[in-house]
């Protein structure tokens, strides 16, 4: 077929194809965060992120096969290796609720008494809890991503 559907996509509607490539699907990222930077390891911390979706689509975590599989998590990677030493999964957010132009605010309260004193980095990611809380969905950003897929945020000292 010389002038089939694919031909029309690229010749008659290429601007729509380019728009779909740029904005289609889901693109999740935290656009606002409140993170503690100095903590006692006997304390309870509170993290308040706001998540946005830059894409038209939604993350289908409301489907039975993905239900509660992917969750937002915060990590304390070792400052030298950037490997997570502690991972805190936030059970509250439902990623399918993150829709374009509708930012969602969440809260994670966590006891960090098991964290050894030292210097760490706060990091955030979307983990797959069926795969040992490894990164399961990449956050929509190009910079400050570790080799494990965590988005690094800021330094933190635990005393």
Positions of the model-derived regions?
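Long, contiguous interaction/targeting segments characteristic
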Residues: 1-25
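Extracellular/luminal regions of secreted and cell-surface proteins that mediate adhesion/ECM remodeling
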Residues: 18-159
């Amino acid at each position: 077929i010389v002038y089939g559907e694919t031909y029309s996509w690229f010749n008659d509607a290429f601007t729509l194809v380019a728009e779909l490539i740029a904005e289609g699907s889901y693109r999740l990222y935290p656009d606002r965060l409140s993170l503690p930077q100095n903590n006692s390891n006997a304390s309870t911390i509170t993290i308040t992120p706001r998540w946005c979706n830059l894409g038209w689509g939604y993350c289908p975590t409301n489907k039975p096969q993905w239900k509660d599989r992917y969750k937002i998590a915060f990590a304390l990677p070792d400052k030298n290796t950037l490997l997570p030493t502690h991972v805190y999964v936030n059970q509250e957010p439902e990623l399918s609720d993150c829709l374009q132009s509708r930012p969602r605010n969440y809260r994670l309260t966590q006891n960090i008494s098991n964290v050894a004193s030292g210097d760490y980095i706060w990091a955030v990611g979307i983990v797959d809890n069926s795969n040992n809380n490894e990164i399961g969905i990449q956050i929509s950003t190009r910079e400050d991503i570790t080799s494990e897929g965590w988005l690094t945020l800021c330094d933190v000292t635990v005393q």
